[in-house]
Amino acid sequence: MIFLAAPTSTAERMEKIAALARGFIYCVSVTGVTGSRENIASGLEAFLAQIRSHTDLPLAVGFGIKSPETAGKAAAIADGVIVGSSLIERIEENLPLVKDEPERVINEVCAYFASLKKAMENTHFAMN
């Protein structure tokens, strides 16, 4: 089971998550609905530092990772980056092409992930 820690999590909850988690901790970068933000929360670095004070597990940031810019910013301070909603959006944008041009859809999604990967190069995440 992967545990989620949010910016609204109390210190007590973070301690409990750290004690029970295995593999990594999923750090929610924003409050609100997933995929609805354009920027990484300004307090994300402090939030990750607070969680790190309770665990040595890798911290993966998700929610709000919509662009190469946000992926790069998250990768600079986290051990992993999780992309969900924006992947679904890319697939949905290309749904009319799935039947007749499935390779084009795959290429569009791969190009999007390549742009995320490029943005994360030479960051803390890529160096570990």
Q: Which sequence ranges carry the predicted segments?
A:
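Histidine/lysine/aspartate-rich catalytic loop segments that bind and position anionic ligands
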Residues: 3-35
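Alpha-helical scaffolding segments of alpha/beta enzyme cores, especially the outer helices
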Residues: 16, 46-50, 73-76, 111, ...
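Active-site-adjacent beta->alpha loops and helix N-cap segments on the catalytic face
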Residues: 9-15, 34-49, 68-71, 94-101
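Glycine- and other small-residue-rich loops at beta-strand/loop junctions that grip anionic moieties
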Residues: 2-6, 36, 40, 63, ...
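Catalytic cores of alpha/beta
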Residues: 9-18, 54-55, 61, 65-81
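Hydrophobic faces of well-ordered beta-strands that scaffold small-molecule active sites
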Residues: 1-5, 25-27, 59-63, 81-83
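Glycine-rich phosphate-binding active-site loops on the catalytic face of alpha/beta enzymes
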Residues: 27-35, 77-97
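C-terminal helical cap(s) of enzyme catalytic domains, especially alpha/beta-barrels
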Residues: 88-125
